[in-house]
Structure formats: C-alpha cells, structure tokens
Amino acid sequence: MPYMAMHGLTVALLLIFLAGGTEAFRICAFNAQRLTLSKLAKEPVMDTLVQILARCDIMVLQEVVDSSQKTVSLLLRELNRFDSSRTYSFLNSSLLGRSTYKEKYVYIYRSDKTQILNSYQYNDTNDLFAREPFVAQFALPSKILPSVVLVPLHTTPKDVEKELNALYDVFLDVSQRWQNEDVILLGDFNADCASLTKKRLNSLLLRTEAGFHWVISDGEDTTVRASTNCTYDRIVMHGQGCQTLLRAAAPFNFPRSFQLTEEEALSISDHYPVEVELSQATHNIQLFSLAILLLLSLLPSQLS
C-alpha cells in the first residue's frame, strides 16, 4: 500500500479510537420531587425523566414516594425502551422518614458499564438523619479508580447543619468498612440560602477536614424557579482516584436543554440534577498504547 494511503488510514483509525476514548463516566443525583406512579402517568413527565436518566451511568434519585416497586419498575422499563443499546438496573432503599411522609433513595445504573459491589443502610443509632444514607459501592471501568462509594443524602431544611456534620461520620464508617477512600457524597443537601448561611456552611466538618472537594461550586443555582438562586444540591468528592479522574461537575439545566417553560419544568421537579463526569482512564490507556503501535507501523513505510 502506498505510504500516503497507509498514512491516511492510520490517521483515520487513530481519530476513531481516540474519539471513543473521550467518553466520560457520569454520576448524577436528582431530587425528583415526590415521584409517584400517578406523576409518571403524565407522558411529558415520563419522557423528560427518561431523557434525564439516559444522560447518566449512575443516577441517585431522591424523593421517590412509593411503598411498592411499581414506580421505579415502570420508569426502568421506559428507560430501557428509550435506548435498547444500553441496559439499566436499579437498587433502592426502604422507605425512610420520621413521620407518615417517607421516601426512598433509588440508584438507577447502566449494568452494561458498572455493577454494585456492596450496599447497606447506614445505622443511624442516634437518629441524626431524617432519611439516613443508603450507601452503595460500584465497580468502575478504570484501573485508577476500580470502585467508588456513593453516599446519598436528602436533608431536612431545619436540620441541615446537624445532618451534614453527621455525614462526616458516615464517610468514616464506610471508608473503614470497605477500605475505600474514594467516596462521593451527593444529593439535595439544602446547603444554601435560608437553610444554611455561608458562615455555617464553612464551619462544617466536610469543609474543615482535609480531602473533601465540593465540586458543585457555591453560587451555582440548582433550582428551577427563576425567583430562587440557591445551591441546594451538592456533590462532594474524597479520594485520590476521584480527584485524578475528575473531568467536570455542574448542575444540568434540563428546562433549557429540553426547551421547557418554567411551568413545564416544575411538573418534573423544582431542582436541577447535579452531575460529575469521570474520565475512563482504562480505555484511554489502552487507546494510547494502540495509537503508539499504529504510529510505529508507519516507520517501515517511511524508511523504504
């Protein structure tokens, strides 16, 4: 094959392979605002939720209000129909809460890309949490970060400071239990505006102890209403693997992306999802090695 043709083919292959290596692993949290079977019966709500979920490799839903599995099962069925090239599964907590109002934490994840290694309900012996975290450890497609622990929390506005300080104890518990320092704390923390002043926020253990990175910045609006501007929803990362692979983190403004009015968006939720993207380091290393081999294959052509 002539050199120029070989060169063109090699470059084309490199571009294809390297483009494939740019895909990120996305972890999300979303307060879906009293998600029930009757809410999912509204077609625009279902359609939008499915599109939001399809963005994420792991999604942690909060405010799932369902004593049965019907709501999540229906949502999962529609999600798997939406993109048949992917396979989604779920894991949920029991109903949690101190009053008659109770809700679940629900993990919806791409089982073709990740698997749950362990999970447990945090033992809140002192009743510090209204909805104690339901913790899960996931396998990731990365040699740098082979697994990560997710700790979701939906605080109550009147106890934000107490619950967020108690979340530090959950971190200690899970990191010792599974010998894993790569932990992501995420959810609707109510960590802003009237629920938590700047001074109280900066005095939290998760702010003063070393190693915790609040990747959803203060000042980011995670609310749908134009009349509010609060960073209620957060993602806090700990661990060298997480920091090494961190690519981006932000709220997902779904009304803007899907061209919804505020009223239409509020039928879904009054919160934006928050997302963090991790580089898929294993894939990138393999592709880099392949790229080197392809480039070396050009040398004989150049020398002849």
From Swiss-Prot:
A molecular function (GO) term: deoxyribonuclease I activity
GO cellular component: endoplasmic reticulum; nucleus
Classification via Pfam families: Exo_endo_phos
Stretch forming the signal peptide: 1-24
Active-site residues, record numbering mapped to chain: E103, H154
Gene Ontology BP terms: DNA catabolic process
Transmembrane regions: none
Main localisation: endoplasmic reticulum
Alphabetical keyword list: Disulfide bond, Endonuclease, Endoplasmic reticulum, Glycoprotein, Hydrolase, Nuclease, Signal
Superkingdom, taxonomy of origin: Eukaryota
Name used for this protein in its record: Deoxyribonuclease-1-like 1
Organism from which the protein derives: Cricetulus griseus
